[in-house]
Amino acid sequence: AAKLDGKKIYVAAGSYEIAKENSGVKIEYSGYSKQVEITIEGGYNPLSTGTDLTKRDVAKYTTAFVRNTSSGASATSNSLLVLGNQTNIIFDGCTFNGQYGLSDAGSVRAVFVAAGGGDATLQLNNCVIKNFNRGSDGGSDGGAAVKVSKGRVLLNQVEMVSNKATGRGGAITTTAANSFLFMNNCLLHENYAPTAWGTSIHAGNGYVCMNNVTVLGTAATGGNSITVNGDAYFMLANTTIVGNSGNPNGVFRAGKNASLVVNSLFAKGAGNRTIYAGNITSGGYNVYQAADAGWGAVATDTDYSSQTLPAATLTDGVYQWTVTGVIDEFATWQAVINAVKSFDATVGQQFVDWVGEAGFGVDQRGATRNVNKMQAGAYDAGL
């Protein structure tokens, strides 16, 4: 542990198999004085290997950690990577590729955060998770991209695409009370859980906090399907969720624990319902269509059901839409920050500290918002 703690590993572009035969990689420590922090930084020009750390371009030089197509990784909980106790693993500029097709009945997820002591942390910055598949599970063990049992997952500028579980979390699932999922400037699209509940995210427990996140709902077939779902404590700020067909329970449901939404957009897309009435408090300035009556709207929220919004498509990595005169209440930067802090005295402040207050004054693309007139959702046209 002492030899690796604080180390940074620089990885050139290329495809690296870390799930072979019946095993992925498990990292776990015990008896050390703290979490062992290891950083893996990708995106380097292979020609500079061993000589030059300035030749880095994540968009041009893809560092991919992949599953061998014959591997089910059964020895590591059907996961490419498992994080156990006393770990703080940071990936920057990396791609995780399960190499499954959506029609496959696969078994392997990307990352399982499963510290028995709850002291595991996964940090992803400027990363992509794609083509993982839990289609062979029974419907209760989803989270094809990330499953959080105990620990913290911090996702900044992460794209999750084309991941699949049978049910409960096509991309992400959380299961324990001490699961913490923080997301900033993230995009989730084309993730599937066709039979039940969270087609993109199923948070059964713990805390889920989002800022500047776009989730495009994907078609499902189950009668209880919904895009983002669970009994966790949710906090959604500056976030966009767009529905699709086959999700009759809408785009967002917070079923049990007290949750908060502020300055977010809930669009029905090809579906016919957005917010499922549950334990939700509005922090104001949300724009929504076809929500359940009594979901918790306040005077500064806007029912946008009379307006037509664009189809569920991405432009410059976000769902873009145009504000009409129906909306006459707009959030300020400070109002959003205050709402986030009010969500939970401890977790709300932790999330603000992690994002940084300035992060609530830009949109998902990094475009500057008008701090006195902010557009709802992850996209801001600069009103």
Q: What residues fall within each predicted segment?
A:
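Residues within well-ordered beta-strands of beta-sheet-rich folds
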Residues: 8-12, 39-43, 90-95, 123, ...
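Short, small/polar residue-rich loop motifs at catalytic or cofactor-binding pockets
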Residues: 354-356
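Glycine-rich repeat segments that build the extracellular carbohydrate-interaction surface of secreted
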Residues: 1-20, 37-46
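Predominantly extracellular beta-rich ligand-binding scaffolds that present long acidic/polar faces
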Residues: 19-31, 35-38, 53-56, 110-116, ...
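Short, acidic, Ser/Thr-enriched surface-loop or helix-capping motifs
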Residues: 363
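Right-handed parallel beta-helix/beta-spiral solenoid domain characteristic of secreted/periplasmic
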Residues: 35-105, 131-133, 164, 300
